[in-house]
Every structure is written in structure tokens, then in C-alpha cells.
């Protein structure tokens, strides 16, 4: 999504990719409210798709609020509601061998002066500003934890058998822990929310070129054309 002088413009897309049988990602694109979200579901059968869809539905149904701080609080509360619901769903289906129902989430709530990113998991938020690309979110994964705590260097951590395991996600634990980042926005800023299926499929250079294009729709089209030209082993989502 792009910050203009008077309003936000955005575009969204999600795709199953070339390997997965179903798409367990969900996206929310509401520029008129200043709310955007990407959720990457996890779990067997339809569990992941249900988890990500519940997140989007709960946030989409929130009453619009012109106060940014209040709107952020509403989104946080909605995610905690979904976290409790997913815990209940797992409890009643615990006889299934793959009774896992959860989802990453990365959300952006913004007005003309400020934006707030909140997330759990490894879906990401990027900022393109003054011809530079910044990753605003930090993955909640074992890989990132090992690096952050200086237990392993990046190359060694990447070889860990559980490197991709998530340390936070909606539905993963009884208490949901969201990380929150607030920042000022400037005209010309472009922000990207995406699942790991996208950022693992394109280079930083490709992402930078896409976010420098004239419109969000053009950026999304460019990103997906490159991501789908490769193996596309995972679901792909971007806003």
C-alpha cells in the first residue's frame, strides 16, 4: 500500500502456488479504513485455512474508528478473541492426529500521520522509503531466536532441523503475544505485508523494484509474476 497526500491506495492478492493442494493464506485489504492484514494458516486438513479466515473475518467486522489508537486496540482484541476460539476448536477436535489450528498474522493500521504494525509469526511487513527497503517486522521463528540470542550464527542456525518452527502464532498458545511497532508515515512511503511464500520466492532486488512502481496494483502484479515463475512451493500472499 502507498501513502499519498490525502489517502492510502492498496492492492491485494493471494495464490495457492504450484505445489500446495489448498490455499491456507487469507488477506484483508481495507484502505478506506486504513486496515490491512495477511494471515498464513497452519494445520492439517482445512485447519490452517479456517484459522487464517477467522482472523480476517473477525478484523473485517470491526466497527470503523477514526481514532488510530482505539482502532489498534480493537484489532488486538479481535486477534485475542480468535486465539481463544482456535484453542477451543483444537480442544473439541483433539481426537484428530493433526489437531493443530493456528495462523501467523501481520496487520497494519494507519492514518495520515502514523501507522502501527502488529504481528505474530513469520509473515512480514516491509517499508520502501527514499529508494531503500526496510524490513520492519522480525520473524517469530526458532531460526530468528537462535540468531537473536547469539546461540548460533545465521548459517549455523539455518541448518537447525527446526529452524522454521514458529515461536508465536495465533492459536499456538493459550496467551497470544503480539509484537507492535509504531512509526510515522511520509508521502511516498510504500508498505508491503506478505507471507513467507512470497518473500522466500523473490529477491530483495525484485521486491525493491516492485515497491518502486507507480501503483500498488502494479507492484503486486510484478511480485506475483516473479514468485510464480519459480517453484512456488508455498501459498503466496501480499498486500
Model-found features: residue ranges?
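PP2C/PPM-type serine/threonine phosphatase catalytic domain
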Residues: 1-239
Amino acid at each position: 500500500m502507498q501513502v499519498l497526500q490525502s489517502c492510502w491506495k492498496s492492492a491485494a492478492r493471494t495464490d495457492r502456488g504450484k505445489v500446495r493442494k489448498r490455499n491456507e493464506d487469507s488477506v484483508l485489504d481495507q484502505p478506506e479504513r486504513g486496515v490491512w492484514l495477511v494471515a498464513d494458516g497452519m494445520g492439517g486438513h482445512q485447519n490452517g485455512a479456517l484459522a487464517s479466515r477467522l482472523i480476517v473475518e473477525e478484523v473485517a467486522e470491526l466497527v470503523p474508528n477514526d481514532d488510530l489508537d482505539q482502532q489498534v486496540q480493537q484489532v488486538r482484541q479481535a486477534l485475542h478473541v480468535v486465539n481463544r476460539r482456535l484453542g477451543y476448536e483444537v480442544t473439541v477436535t483433539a481426537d484428530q492426529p493433526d489437531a493443530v489450528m493456528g495462523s501467523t498474522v501481520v496487520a497494519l493500521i494507519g492514518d495520515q500521520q502514523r501507522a502501527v504494525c502488529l504481528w505474530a509469526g513469520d509473515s512480514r511487513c516491509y517499508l520502501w522509503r527514499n529508494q531503500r527497503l526496510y524490513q520492519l517486522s522480525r520473524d517469530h521463528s526458532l531460526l530468528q531466536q537462535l540468531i537473536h540470542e547469539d546461540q548460533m550464527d545465521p548459517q549455523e542456525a539455518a541448518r537447525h532441523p527446526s529452524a522454521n518452527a514458529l515461536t508465536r502464532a495465533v492459536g499456538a498458545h493459550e496467551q497470544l503475544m503480539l509484537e507492535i511497532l509504531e512509526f510515522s508515515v511520509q508521502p511516498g512511503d510504500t508498505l508491503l505485508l506478505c507471507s513467507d511464500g512470497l518473500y522466500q520466492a523473490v529477491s530483495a532486488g525484485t521486491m525493491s523494484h516492485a515497491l518502486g512502481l507507480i501503483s500498488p496494483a502494479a507492484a503486486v502484479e510484478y511480485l506475483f509474476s516473479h514468485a510464480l515463475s519459480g517453484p512456488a512451493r508455498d501459498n503466496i500472499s501480499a498486500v
